[in-house]
Curated annotation (Swiss-Prot):
The gene is rluA. Keywords: Isomerase, rRNA processing, tRNA processing. Its EC number is 5.4.99.28, 5.4.99.29. GO terms for biological process: enzyme-directed rRNA pseudouridine synthesis; tRNA processing. The keyword Transcription does not apply. Dual specificity enzyme that catalyzes the synthesis of pseudouridine from uracil-746 in 23S ribosomal RNA and from uracil-32 in the anticodon stem and loop of transfer RNAs. Belongs to the pseudouridine synthase RluA family. The keyword Acyltransferase does not apply. This is Dual-specificity RNA pseudouridine synthase RluA.
């Protein structure tokens, strides 16, 4: 399933929300690739834009092109290695916000559905109980909405426990509440409701690659401005980077 047209937003060119000698955090807009695609016309990306000013910048995790929000990048090889290892051992925690179709009745819950690539229709993913990889998402209703025409939507707070490709999008579809604006997984009426995928990476906790102390970074959500820092209300990690020898292998 090829990308038909790529016109990423350019204003602002980059939106840096935090920087020190080791890491850089940026608010990626919806519609911009995290890293360059295979074709020359898909070179423009969050990484390539930052590389213009930071030649040694390294990507340690990615967001889908259609997803907006927080990306943390490494400014040197040592920081890159340290952060990638944290993602590998699942020491990082994330909070996303999404506007989904319909009213979600449960106030909160857990979606535990294994996912696998839908190869004939890649990059789509699908639920597969036989061969899928374990995938778990916690969700919580933040706000139920009703538009003037009677259309019902819900703002949900999403806490991915695993980090599979398209996990949040497929899990919300499986729950019967696809994310609005999702060209891959939404119903037609949910897809045309918004010009963009309303999925935003709002908060990330990690251990600083130099000090090894726990910290978090937050970026506001454009479609849910009420969002606020709360990652440590849901997760209670150790305050100092644990010894990897004491952790189970990923």
């Amino acid at each position: 399933m090829a990308m038909l047209e790529y016109n990423p937003p350019t204003d602002p060119w980059t939106d840096i929300v935090f920087e020190d000698d080791h890491i850089l955090a940026v608010n990626k807009p919806s519609g911009l690739l995290s890293v360059p695609g295979r074709l020359a016309e898909h070179h423009d990306s969050m990484w390539s834009r930052l590389q213009e000013e930071y030649p040694d910048i390294q990507v340690v995790h990615r967001l889908d092109m259609s997803t907006s929000g927080l990306m943390v990048l490494a400014k040197n090889k040592r920081a890159e290695s340290a952060l990638k290892k944290q993602f590998q051992f699942r020491l990082t925690h994330k909070i996303y916000y999404a506007r989904v179709w319909g009213h979600v009745e449960q106030e909160e819950g857990e979606i535990d559905l294994p996912l696998i690539c839908d190869w004939p229709n890649r990059p789509l993913q699908k639920v597969c109980f036989e061969d899928g990889k374990p995938s778990k998402t916690l969700f919580q209703v933040a706000k139920r909405e009703e538009q003037e025409d009677g259309t019902k939507t819900t703002i949900v707070r999403l806490l991915p426990i695993t980090g599979r490709s398209h996990q949040l999008r497929v899990h919300m579809q499986a729950l019967g509440h696809p994310i609005v604006g999702d060209e891959f997984y939404a119903t037609e009426e949910a897809k045309v409701f918004s010009e963009r995928l309303e999925l935003h990476a709002s908060e990330l906790s990690f251990y600083h690659p130099k000090s090894h102390w726990l910290r978090s970074i937050f970026v506001p959500c454009d479609f849910y401005p009420e969002a606020e820092e709360m990652i440590f209300d849901y997760f209670d990690p150790e305050r100092k980077l644990p010894d990897y020898k004491t952790l189970p292998r990923p």
